[in-house]
A protein has these predicted regions:
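Compact soluble domain cores
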Residues: 2-65
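Short, compact, well-ordered microdomains
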Residues: 59, 64-100
Length: 100
């Protein structure tokens, strides 16, 4: 089990594309491994500019994008949508970059 000490933001509804689920299964990895990193502010393999943008997004409620490499080298993204007018994030999506 992977525990998150203090989430930086709410994920909303968690969804995934079939391709991302297949890639995770083939790599024998759980989506929770990456969701827990995402919600804790470990943005994975993003550039410094995207890392800084994500840090700001936690504060201002805009969209958050993380990228992670699976054991087999496949890259997955996790995108958490921007907050609505009530401060709620609707969903977080796990996907392959080519599914964007």
């Amino acid at each position: 089990m992977i525990a998150v000490k203090s989430p930086l933001f709410k994920l909303g509804v968690i969804v995934s594309t079939p391709g991302a689920l297949r890639a995770l299964q083939e790599a024998d990895q759980s989506p929770w491994e990456f969701l827990s990193r995402h919600v804790a502010g470990d943005w994975g393999v993003v550039c410094d500019e995207d890392r800084q943008a994500n840090d700001e997004s936690v504060k201002d409620g805009s969209r958050i994008l993380s990228a992670y490499l699976l054991k087999d080298g496949t890259k997955i993204w996790i995108i958490t949508e921007a907050e609505d007018d009530n401060g709620n994030r609707a969903c977080s999506t796990i996907l392959l970059p080519e599914n964007y």
